[in-house]
């Protein structure tokens, strides 16, 4: 113990001050745990690790590892959600590390693995099971697991590591089932995720089958939706233009449509995806992974038709080509394996037309 001098109201007072190291039990604790997660940087996915250490000391919650604001905000989301399931954060020093530290971590997909690794450090779930588990998902204030973008691309990267089990939001289960015969479990809440981790191998398999059956029953009506692409055979007239379109589609050539307004140029362009060859399973995976990374994958199911992208002629270079500090796909990328239609091209600025002048349909 040492003494410090404080001046209060003009009077000198000697106050005792205790060094933290003098308190018993302040030595470093052994509550350490690790889990596997997935991250997305542009269209590139990678496998990440989330580590937590809970030790004695002043209560704090530190998150390190080159994190974006979306990841740092998980601190408050998890504080409330863990309290909702009667697993409040301990009044100790909590340090969470996200590796690899050289890659910017963005998005909300790290919420679920962070919550699970904290629960394991508190003894709520077996820590040894998390080392063979891969998890992504956003955690709400009410402990519900919400949909995240890029699950399809992240699962492709995680599949190379051959983890024992994969934990994703239930709303993303369609993307997980499309990757292949992976042991993917879709969960709706943090309690369900804890139940799955604590269950035996046979019980986990039963829970995965039940989740798949629930998703299939909900997605049955959504998968039987009408085609979006207009039928090329319903176009009347314009025989020369239709022949030019068929030649361009057969050879994947560029096509320039010129003519007065109202002659059917836009309708002809919208029908082009319908006469292109059907996408293979590999192409469906590619296109769906791009739209999943962009957060535009509808209903969590694979895209079956070739995309048709028609940006406005006033679109910016950033929106057209993509990019940014945290790269995001642009219109050109969204038209992968499909048709990019530049309407009113004469009104577009030259810096918009130049990046796309060598693109084929």
What are these regions (language model features)?
Residues 259, 322, 344:
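The Walker A (P-loop) glycine that initiates the GxxxxGKT/S ATP-binding motif of P-loop NTPases
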